[in-house]
Amino acid sequence: MIVPSFPGFGFSSPLPDNPDMNFWKVADLWHSLMTDILGHERYAAGGCDVGALVCGQLGHKYAGELYGIHAQVVALEKRFAVHLAAHVLAPSTLAYGLSDSPAGMLAWILERWVNWSDNGGDIEHVFSKDDLCTHATIYWVTNSIGTSIRTYANNNRYPWVPSHDRQPPVEAPTGITFVGYENPPGVSTDRRVQHFLESDRAGWYNLVNLTAHDHGGHFIPWEIPDQWVDDLRRTFREPAPTTRSEAGPSWPS
């Protein structure tokens, strides 16, 4: 298993010669890492949040060299509105403030961990104090909160350019994990898969595995790691399309 660090996020320094770095350019870097540098002829990719965007681009541009991709699909809700607006519209203003105050940066990050995780009102049910301080310290000591924010602005500023016009756009076998805490309003977990299949977004993917879990929030690999790993394995091994909820498997008609 290979876990690359996203440029500008914590462990990975920003690339000074690539100020326009965004998710689809990161996909090119990761594909080069896997094939040219590490020598893999084929590989599989999984990710959440911005990592899910990278996986989607890999499955679009490099489908023939992937066993498949597995990702989280986020329902765009009002709880994410302030976060996205600030990152996209005023990244530098926000970055200066957060880079100047460790307490301010921790408060900004903590608010998202509290509100976006399925914690039942107790954040330490998901993240221990040590986890929280470790995550925040990685951003602080590397001074990378600003460069991480810039990625969101670049995703919007430099729009995605398709590599081909074939259908579906993401041709690699694709699995998706849904979690109850991010169900759209009025949609229960047992209806989540069907709700997605009836949406326009489903047509973007060569779907082979859709799984909905009652529990779990935005930070899926951290919150429900065992289920996430099981979902990945099914996607990369599944011989035929499947859908599952925590009530059990079902088969598309």
Regions found by a protein language model. Name each.
Residues 24-43, 53, 61:
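Conserved acidic catalytic loop of the alpha/beta-hydrolase fold
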Residues 57-92:
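A catalytic-pocket lid/entrance helix-loop region that shapes and gates access to the active site
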